[in-house]
């Protein structure tokens, strides 16, 4: 009987976690030793629509880019915005939060976000051309491209490489 009740408890816990988690595609987080990138849907908090000026990363760092697919992007150095960095042997844990602060009322909401960098990582300039796609890779020589909107509206693509 005990294994059965334990299994039921896990099932209930999983159901609650799934219900509370909502849309898993609402947040995408990537990082390296030097930068932190987050891409969020404007409806991240319980399908409440956020304007770009109401969304913040960490200690009130504003949205850096609104993408054509209506997502908000944050692209900051990992030592800015109150991002907490913890080191465990060859692993780096970056922790911060996404905040919503309504401009029309006192409503606020927060969601913790974190990102892990393992082994050695490097960042180098690839090109001035934009690349698109949300393809994931699980190879050991991981290469993930990002687009950063620069001050002069040029798209600069960077790569995270871990070996």
From Swiss-Prot:
Compartment list? Secreted
Cite the entry's keywords alphabetically: Secreted, Signal
Q: Name one GO cellular component term.
A: extracellular region
Which residues does UniProt assign to the signal peptide?
Answer: 1-21
In which tissues has expression of this protein been reported? Oocyte-specific.
Primary location class: secreted
Q: What does this protein do?
A: May be involved in cell differentiation.
Q: Which family does it belong to?
A: Belongs to the PLAC1 family.
- Know the name of this protein? Oocyte-secreted protein 1
What is the native source organism of this protein? Bos taurus
Q: Gene that codes for this?
A: OOSP1
């Amino acid at each position: 009987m005990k294994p059965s009740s334990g299994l039921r408890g896990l099932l209930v816990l999983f159901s609650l976690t799934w219900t509370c988690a909502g849309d898993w595609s609402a947040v995408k987080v990537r990082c390296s030793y030097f930068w932190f990138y987050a891409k969020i849907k404007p409806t991240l908090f319980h399908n409440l629509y956020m304007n770009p000026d109401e969304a913040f990363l960490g200690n009130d760092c504003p949205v850096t880019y609104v993408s054509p697919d209506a997502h908000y992007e944050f692209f900051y150095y990992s030592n800015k915005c109150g991002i907490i960095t913890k080191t465990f042997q060859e692993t780096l844990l970056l922790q911060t939060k996404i905040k919503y602060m309504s401009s029309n009322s006192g409503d606020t909401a927060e969601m913790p976000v974190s990102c892990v960098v393992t082994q050695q990582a490097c960042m180098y300039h690839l090109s001035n051309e934009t690349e698109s796609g949300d393809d994931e890779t699980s190879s050991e020589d991981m290469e993930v491209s990002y687009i950063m909107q620069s001050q002069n509206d040029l798209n600069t693509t960077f790569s995270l490489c871990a070996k």
